[in-house]
């Protein structure tokens, strides 16, 4: 609703939109999305971005992403995994990993990162794909253990954590981002 209202706002520089990656994904999920992310907005800045993380409980049998993938290949449909919700960038990243790795695993979409993380902590799912910021505290405290991330190359804040590309899964590179946008048509002098 808010993104649609921003898209319809007068292009006078008084309305700005701060949105997550969802603003790009939503039109592919909702047939009647009230905006087009390319046509209706002028990008101003990326405010931040970080990769998604594939994480397990510390006592998980999977020491690496390769261990998890090998088990999943040998045991189709035996593993279940969580994302914050269907259609989120973590969900899409997890699906790309599943498809590119050729594994059959069951996705469980939750109603936000909080419930998905709680399910992981409670052992209700085998692994979680979530935005790094959603699991940062659990990773640092040892409540969850990261197997891989969806960024490109090694990350400065997690230099020992491999990317999924390092396991031969290419095309799954994705970040969850936060962007600042204006309605299309705002004059350039107003934007600068």
Spans of features found by a protein language model:
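Hinge/capping helix and adjacent helix->loop/strand transition within the periplasmic-binding protein
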Residues: 8-14, 28-115, 164, 174-192
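Paired acidic/hydrophobic, glycine-rich loop segments that form the ligand-binding mouth/hinge
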Residues: 13-19, 80, 126-130, 145-148
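Adenylate-forming
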Residues: 3, 24-28
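Conserved helix-loop-beta element of the AMP-binding
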Residues: 42, 68, 143-156, 173
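Beta->alpha turn/N-cap motifs
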Residues: 18-23, 112-113, 130-135, 150-152, ...
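Cytochrome P450 core scaffold surrounding the K-helix E-X-X-R motif
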Residues: 27, 156-158
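Short helices/loops that flank or line small-molecule/ion binding pockets
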Residues: 2-11, 96-100, 114-124, 128, ...
